[in-house]
């Protein structure tokens, strides 16, 4: 036991984390805080432009210089294996938790040699990401299966946040897969934040305010939101769209909206989490068009704020939003129709349903599930079954 007070030192390694990244950064922060509160010693290792070693609410955060991955809009990776290996040797972890199955898969082999139990967290589906980049489905599935077999062999356990994310591992017969849903801050994200003044400011005189909270990159399909807005307006729905997020497609999307005369406001990355929650509460409907999402924290945050969400039928989000949202196939027309279907219900009804669904997903339950995957729970708590409503 390396941590203070008999807890475990859980070293977490993650790529694709920047000051402006969204769901993964939030999940790492909240899980780290939860591990600390449970008496463990979390250490997060991430890439950055300069080296640093700081203490934060989520525990110790070590930044190792890493190169920017071209075409990702600033994402960096832990490419210096020698330096990472030496850091792992120095930290002498009791557990490792890895949030990247590509360039960090080798750490599973390090853990096996060091006799350290290891967990890989699947934050995306390999075949889903490949398909969003234009790889034919059959070829994407074969490539994903090869990658996932190596991943399942390399790590003691694979953690998936939804049943949907598990499927590609079930397909290859992996038996070391466990499920651990993510959570949402139900105090920060709440319906009471809804402001008519803020809504009117962003709606700009339109009757319906749509919101997209997303990284503006290919795999997130942000263009679907613009096209759905155009479909709605062509059908006589007076709607406006606000986009909170940044990424490599931002310039192209701005030009597209301008050329088509669409009422779209691009806010860029909203760093203030309180301001983002205000925005999520002010919207009438949020859009989540990414077809490869394995959980969708921004969609869950919108639900917690009382705002229903239209999600891609190709993603895990139908499993997350349940009856509190609407599911659409990956076409602008389908997303527009789903928006109209949600708006047809009384506002009070749809907002209560959204909040009720979000209340199923607490960070306390998430932390417990992740610690269970690490065999890091007290014996009595480890035997406690997962709540049925989370498993569904």
Stretch-by-stretch model annotation:
Residues 11, 203-230:
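Conserved donor-binding/catalytic core segment of Leloir-type glycosyltransferases
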Residues 46, 62-65, 141, 145-194, ...:
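Donor nucleotide-sugar binding/catalytic pocket of nucleotide-sugar-dependent glycosyltransferases
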Residues 79, 117, 128-150:
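Nucleotide-sugar donor phosphate/pyrophosphate-binding loop at the beta->alpha transition
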Residues 152, 269, 277-283:
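Short alpha-helical donor nucleotide-sugar binding micro-motif in glycosyltransferases
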Residues 251-270:
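Nucleotide-activated donor-binding/catalytic signature segment of Leloir-type glycosyltransferases, i.e.
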Residues 291:
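Aromatic "clamp/platform" in nucleotide-sugar-dependent glycosyltransferases that forms part
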Residues 308-311:
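Short hydrophobic beta-strand element within catalytic cores of glycosyltransferases
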Residues 323-333, 340-346:
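Conserved acidic donor-binding segment of nucleotide-sugar-dependent glycosyltransferases
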């Amino acid at each position: 036991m390396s941590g203070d007070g008999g807890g475990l030192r859980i070293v977490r390694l993650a790529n694709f984390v920047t000051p402006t990244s969204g769901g993964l950064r939030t999940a790492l922060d909240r899980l780290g805080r939860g591990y600390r509160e449970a008496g463990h010693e979390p250490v997060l290792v991430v890439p950055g432009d300069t080296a640093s070693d700081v203490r934060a609410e989520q525990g110790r955060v070590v930044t190792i210089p890493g190169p920017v991955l071209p075409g990702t809009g600033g994402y960096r990776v832990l490419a210096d294996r020698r330096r990472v290996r030496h850091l792992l040797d120095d930290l002498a972890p009791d557990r490792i938790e890895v949030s990247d199955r590509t360039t960090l898969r080798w750490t599973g082999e390090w853990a096996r040699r060091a006799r350290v139990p290891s967990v890989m967290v699947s934050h995306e589906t390999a075949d889903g990401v490949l398909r969003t980049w234009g790889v034919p489905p059959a070829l994407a599935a074969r490539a994903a299966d090869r990658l996932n077999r190596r991943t399942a062999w390399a790590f003691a356990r694979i953690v998936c946040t939804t049943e949907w994310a598990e499927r590609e591992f079930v397909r290859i017969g992996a038996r070391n897969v466990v499920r651990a849903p993510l959570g949402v801050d139900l105090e920060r994200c709440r319906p009471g934040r809804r402001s008519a003044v803020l809504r009117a400011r962003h709606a700009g005189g339109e009757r319906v305010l749509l919101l997209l909270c997303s990284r503006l990159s290919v795999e997130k399909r942000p263009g679907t939101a613009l096209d759905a807005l155009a479909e709605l307006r062509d059908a006589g729905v007076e709607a406006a769209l606000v986009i909170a997020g940044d990424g490599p497609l931002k310039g192209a999307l701005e030009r597209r909206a301008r050329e088509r005369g669409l009422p779209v406001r691009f806010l860029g990355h909203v760093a203030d989490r309180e301001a983002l929650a205000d925005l999520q509460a002010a919207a009438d409907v949020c859009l989540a068009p990414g077809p490869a999402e394995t959980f969708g924290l921004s969609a869950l945050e919108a639900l917690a704020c009382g705002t229903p969400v239209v999600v891609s039928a190709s993603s895990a989000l139908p499993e997350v939003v349940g009856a509190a949202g609407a599911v659409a196939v990956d076409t602008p027309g389908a997303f527009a129709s789903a928006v109209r279907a949600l708006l047809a219900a009384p506002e009070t009804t749809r907002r209560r349903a959204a909040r009720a669904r979000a209340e199923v997903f607490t960070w306390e339950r998430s932390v417990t599930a992740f610690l269970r995957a690490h065999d890091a729970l007290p014996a009595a708590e480890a035997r406690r079954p997962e709540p049925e409503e989370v498993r569904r």
